[in-house]
UniProtKB/Swiss-Prot annotation:
Soluble hydrogenase catalyzes both production and consumption of hydrogen from suitable artificial electron donors or acceptors. This subunit catalyzes the tritium-exchange activity. InterPro entries: Aminotrans_V_dom, Aminotrans_V_PyrdxlP_BS, PyrdxlP-dep_Trfase, PyrdxlP-dep_Trfase_major, PyrdxlP-dep_Trfase_small, SP_NH2Trfase/AEP_transaminase. This is Soluble hydrogenase, small subunit. The modification N6-(pyridoxal phosphate)lysine is found at residue 194. It is found in: Cytoplasm. GO terms for molecular function: alanine-glyoxylate transaminase activity; L-serine-pyruvate transaminase activity; oxidoreductase activity.
Length: 384
């Protein structure tokens, strides 16, 4: 049944019914006073979610658009940048830097493992003669289910003194605390189809005063993604280009839901769902791709043995209409990924684990005790 479909992927994530109803409203003029009022309310709500007093700009784009904007607005061709690469999205930001003619130095870790903060210190210390202009880090690496130690990496960047820190928080913002002001994060990009609980189409970029100073001398080409245009219009509660008006309706409703739950409760819920999911996979003897010490609260990657990952995904969809994410690039067919991001609760985890047990049995996987996964998840959920 199509109306019973479950999205257990890291994006797009499930959308609450109240948000869907907001999407169904008649559009309004994006140059109207009514839209300006919505923009003003969104500005305050977005700052609350970002834990910042910095400007947070809203673009009609994806998370990749947010990150490209976050890179090109503050740098010039030939600038030295350091990019952390331990998955598909860290690699992507390196590709963006290469495309714009930046001098890109990559700090790498194997997929499934976190970046080593000390590697950033060593590289930045070696750049004293020609300092790096920016360090680009993916907080939650969606492709592998790894969360990087952003706080520790940021400490090394701050000790360096000059470099901006540019953060991909696409699957961390709204799932784990990203205290932008407390940590002094300069540029933070995210997308609406993740922790925001609304469909794809909006991107968000938080910009610090230090980054705006860099903007004044940055010369990389930009037009639609020129954040200066968005800043100027945001001050008047409008946008430089036509926005997806109904997504702003949805964002307003979603932010009201999040504020009613509270930031700490949101973070605790994601932590609890992650722990329940990982406990279930261990009980089913399904190897986890990332260690507990670096597990992302947004997504769990599983590397099954004795049963094909793609067969699991296919049968989960066919039998139960539950969508799981697959592996990307060289991990395609090697892992499957369970999203527990955004509008996901205890019932969703228990339903997904129960369905997974049935699928494993149907595929002939016998290395588990029936009911063990559900029991393990239930224990976590009942005590957390």
């Amino acid at each position: 049944m199509q109306d019973k479909a479950m999205l257990m992927i890291p994006g797009p994530t499930p959308v609450p019914e109240s948000v869907l109803l907001s999407l169904g409203k008649h559009p309004i003029g994006h140059r109207s006073g009514e839209f300006s009022q919505i923009m003003a309310a969104m500005t305050a709500g977005i700052k609350w979610l970002h834990q910042t007093q910095n400007e947070v700009l809203i673009l009609a784009a994806s998370g990749t658009g947010a990150m490209e904007a976050g890179i090109i607005n503050f740098l010039s061709a030939g600038d030295r940048v350091v990019v952390g690469c331990n998955g598909k999205f860290g690699d992507r930001w390196g590709e963006v830097c290469d495309a714009y003619g930046l001098t890109t130095e990559r700090i790498s870790a194997p997929w499934g493992q976190p970046l080593n903060p000390d590697d950033f210190k060593a590289v930045l210390d070696g750049h004293r003669q020609k300092p790096s202009k920016a360090v680009i880090v993916t907080h939650s690496e969606t492709s592998t289910g790894v969360i990087n130690d952003l706080e520790a990496i940021n400490r090394h960047v701050k000790a360096h003194g000059q470099a901006l820190i540019i953060v991909d928080a696409v699957t961390s913002l709204g799932a784990v605390s990203v205290p932008i002001d407390e940590w002094g994060l300069d540029v933070v990009g995210s997308g609406s189809q993740k922790g925001y609980m609304i469909p794809p189409g909006l991107a968000f970029v938080s910009v610090s005063p230090k980054a705006w100073e860099a903007y004044k001398t940055a010369t990389l080409p930009k037009f639609y993604l020129d954040l200066g245009k968005y800043r100027k219009d945001a001050a008047k509660h409008t946008t430089p280009f036509t926005p997806p008006v109904n997504l702003f309706f949805a964002l307003k409703t979603a932010l009201e839901m999040m504020q009613a739950e509270g930031l700490e409760a949101i973070f605790q819920r994601h932590q609890r769902l992650m722990q329940a999911t990982r406990a279930a996979m261990k009980a089913l003897n399904l190897p986890l791709y990332a260690a507990d010490s670096c597990a992302s609260p947004a997504i769990t990657a599983v590397a099954p043995q004795g049963v094909e990952a793609e067969n699991i995904r296919s049968l989960m969809k066919k039998r139960f209409d539950i969508a799981l994410a697959g592996g990307q690039d060289h991990l395609k067919g090697q892992i499957f990924r369970i999203g527990h991001l955004g509008f996901v609760g205890d019932r969703d985890i228990l339903a997904a684990v129960s369905a997974l047990e049935a699928v494993l049995a149907e595929l002939g996987y016998t290395n588990f005790t029936p009911g063990a996964g559900v029991a393990a998840a239930s224990r976590v959920l009942s005590t957390a």
